[in-house]
Design a protein with these regions (language model features):
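Intrinsic-disorder/low-complexity detector
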Residues: 1-134
């Protein structure tokens, strides 16, 4: 699967990417939740992103405050900023079926990127521990 493409021309694609970052922020900030952002908002966000992304952004502001690691918090803020900047000047009010597919693609590709970034951070930590033990 390809990774997130910040140069993709579809605003719907970047809306999906923003959704993925919001979900990742919640996952890091709150380990045990009854219903995730994705479970609650994915369907409506993929149809009416202008309405839903504002609500999710408010939740993410709260979740970001809960992330104790300042470096990690800034990484997520920067990723979220990149996704929103790539949307352009207007968040689409509604999405056609084709645009919903681009939303899903952006969501999945950003999830892949975020997981890859996380795996790289874990690998660096493991390597640092190995170096210290030698």
């Amino acid at each position: 699967m390809s990774e997130y493409d910040p140069k993709n021309k579809s605003a719907a694609y970047h809306c999906g990417a923003a959704m993925a970052v919001h979900a990742a922020i919640q996952n890091v900030a709150m380990k045990n939740v009854n219903a995730t952002i994705v479970q609650r908002y994915y369907s409506s966000a993929s149809q009416m992103p202008a309405l839903v992304l504002g609500q999710i952004s408010r939740l993410s502001a709260y979740h970001l405050e809960k992330i104790e690691n300042e470096w990690l918090r800034k990484q997520y803020e920067e990723e979220l900023n990149r996704a929103y900047c790539a949307i352009g000047n207007e968040i689409p009010a509604t999405l056609t079926l084709e645009q919903q597919a681009y939303f899903a693609l952006g969501y999945r590709q950003m999830c892949t990127k975020l997981q890859k970034d996380k795996n790289e951070r874990i690998e660096k930590i493991k390597n640092n521990v190995k170096d210290q033990n030698m």
